[in-house]
């Protein structure tokens, strides 16, 4: 009995995760537009604020070509300041991360994770 022919595997992408740089902002905004069509993307002002407040918590997933295929944004919060019913806006200071609290906070809050819809598996 012969096995059915297998479809050749697509070439694997080499993706590297690194911290966000200001030069990434246009690509992050474009990624946001592809990921959430019709919704307002992150603004350069908000992305810049995230970098000012907590650069170690902002990441991009980049292909060797330089194309950005993923983005993650985090901040540290003091969980005791929040209730489970609080909104994303409450946890993120309206998306500006003004409530980032590296002194009293012990919880890394994932405010955003997006992956380009063209490469999702």
Regions found by a protein language model. Give the residues of each.
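A short beta-loop-alpha structural element at the N-terminal edge
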Residues: 14-28
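Short loop/turn motifs at secondary-structure junctions and domain boundaries
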Residues: 49-55
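Glycine-rich phosphate/pyrophosphate-binding loop shared by adenosine-nucleotide-utilizing enzymes
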Residues: 13-15, 66-71, 108
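Helix-loop element at the rim of GNAT/NAT acetyltransferase active sites that forms part
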Residues: 30-43
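Conserved acyl-donor/pantetheine-binding loop and adjacent beta-alpha core of acyl/acetyltransferases
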Residues: 72-114
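Conserved beta-hairpin
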Residues: 57-72, 85-88, 118
């Amino acid at each position: 009995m012969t096995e059915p022919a297998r479809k050749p595997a697509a070439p694997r992408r080499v993706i590297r995760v690194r911290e966000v740089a200001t030069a990434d902002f246009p690509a992050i905004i474009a990624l946001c537009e592809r990921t959430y069509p019709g919704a307002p993307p992150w603004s350069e002002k908000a992305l810049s604020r995230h970098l000012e407040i907590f650069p170690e918590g902002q990441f991009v997933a980049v292909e060797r070509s330089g194309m950005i295929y993923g983005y993650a944004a985090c901040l540290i919060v003091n969980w005791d300041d929040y209730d489970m019913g609080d909104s994303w806006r409450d946890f993120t200071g309206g998306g500006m991360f003004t409530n980032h609290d590296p002194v009293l906070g012990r919880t890394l809050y994932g405010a955003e994770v997006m992956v380009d819809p063209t490469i999702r598996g």
